[in-house]
Each structure stands twice: as C-alpha cells, then as structure tokens.
Amino acid sequence: MAYYFGAVVSELNPAVLPLDWLLGTWQSDEPGEGSFPSITPFRYTETLHFSHVGQPVINFMFNAFHAESKKPLHRECGFIRIQPGTNRVAFIVAQNSGLVEIEEGELTGQQLTLHSTAVARTSFAKQPYVQQISRHIQLKPDGRLEQTVSMALEGQSLTQHLHITYRRTD
C-alpha cells in the first residue's frame, strides 16, 4: 500500500515497478553545486518527492533553495513514464521559470540517463533561452541518490549545470 498526500492508494502499477527505487522523499545530504559559464557559481539544497497513485506513472516534485540565503530557487514537477516492454523512459517536466521539457532516455538498473527531446517556454521567459537539457540520476551503492543536470543555452554548448547527492528521508 502506498500513500499520496495522506490518502491510501493502490499498489504500485507494474509498469513503473522498475522505478520503485526512486519512491519516497530525498533530501540533499550536503549542498549541491550549480555553475554555468554565464552565472556566478552557487550552492543549493534540494528536496525531491517521488510518489504514485497507482497509475503507470511516477509523480515528482523537486524544490531547491539557495544554501546560504535559503531563498527559493528552481521548482520542478512532473511525471516519469516507461514505454511498456522496454527500458525507454520519459521525464515530463514543468519548471517555475516557465520552462517545460520532455526528456527521454534509458533506465539501466538503478540509473536514468535522459536528454531533452522538446523544450518550450513562456513568451516572456528570460534570455538566453535553454535549448537542450540532459539529466543523469543514479542510486549509488551507499544508498545515496545522485543527480547531474547539464544544459545548453543559445550560443553555448551542453555544459554541466547542477550536481547534487541526496539521502532518503522516508
């Protein structure tokens, strides 16, 4: 039995059973590192929530805060789907910055490697515009979750932007 916002829901849908290692709440175990050629490097903390309601998708919500000032940074929410009968995975993401993306890739054991196949933004999004995103999430042998995000902006090639590790808190 699983819980979602206090309500009891059905068992995990078999379609997303290969992603059960993500379920729960994860908190950064130390501040992550953010950098990009066009910004001042920064440190951040982040909480990840992965849940389900018995459908063939995993729901997620990511909340990041500046490590020193504690000001809110990026917020991401969305869904993870698996193409039935394959290891093909899709991340469908909406960010508080007005960016929406679809990332697709592969699930290999307990790691996800994803690359954007579509990136859209609000008409008044901040420039330079994000053109491409890649994400690597893996469960380490010590039980920590690690995430690395790279991005490309207009006129800049794909470059690592974020790196952080988490510990499960529930």
PLM feature spans:
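Hydrophobic/aromatic beta-strand elements that line small-molecule binding cavities or substrate pockets
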Residues: T45-S51, E76-R81, I102-E106, Q132-L139, ...
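Short, surface-exposed beta-strand-loop junctions and turns on beta-sheet-rich folds
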Residues: H66-A67, S97-L99, A120-R121, L153-E154
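Amphipathic/hydrophobic helical signal segments and adjacent flexible N-terminal regions
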Residues: M1-V57, M61, F65-P72, D142, ...
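Short, solvent-exposed coil/turn segments at beta-strand boundaries
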Residues: V53-P56, G85, L107-Q110, K140-R144
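Helix-adjacent hinge/juxtasegments
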Residues: A67-E106
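Short hydrophobic/aromatic-rich beta-strand segments that constitute the beta-sheet cores
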Residues: S28, I58-F62, R88-V93, L112-S116, ...
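Acidic, glycine-rich flexible loop segments
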Residues: G98-L99, L107, T113-S134
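Short conserved catalytic/interaction loops centered on acidic-Pro-aromatic/His motifs
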Residues: F124-P128, T148, S157-T159
